[in-house]
């Protein structure tokens, strides 16, 4: 049984948000790098960088907070398609999160992208997670 790196990343970010931690470290894989790029592009995180320690490679996410109470920009981060139950959708049936306020991250034949990009390109794929 393998590790679910996406669920590991989501849980690490969720826990860091609860503790109001500025940075979080997750194992680097191609999928986590691409999801990190999307989160950065959509404005959910401040920054992320790659860090190599001995032979292990990590991504360090700098989380974004607003106001004096440090309210996190990422309210909810939910894993949808899991290793035991994959969820796929064509471009017409990709769900909208909070009426378009949140994003759906999909794994498509053209790479990992948001729901808006997938609808524009008219391609479906595996629904990885919801972010809002």
From Swiss-Prot:
Subunit: Part of the 30S ribosomal subunit.
GO CC, alphabetical: chloroplast; ribonucleoprotein complex; ribosome
Gene field: rps8
Species whose genome carries this gene: Physcomitrium patens (Spreading-leaved earth moss)
Entry-linked PANTHER family: 40S RIBOSOMAL PROTEIN S15A
Family: Belongs to the universal ribosomal protein uS8 family.
Function: One of the primary rRNA binding proteins, it binds directly to 16S rRNA central domain where it helps coordinate assembly of the platform of the 30S subunit.
Gene Ontology BP terms: translation
Subcellular location: Plastid, Chloroplast
Protein name: Small ribosomal subunit protein uS8c
GO molecular function: rRNA binding; structural constituent of ribosome
HAMAP family: Ribosomal_uS8_B
UniProt entry keywords in alphabetical sequence: Chloroplast, Plastid, Ribonucleoprotein, Ribosomal protein, RNA-binding, rRNA-binding
Xref: Pfam families: Ribosomal_S8 (PF00410)
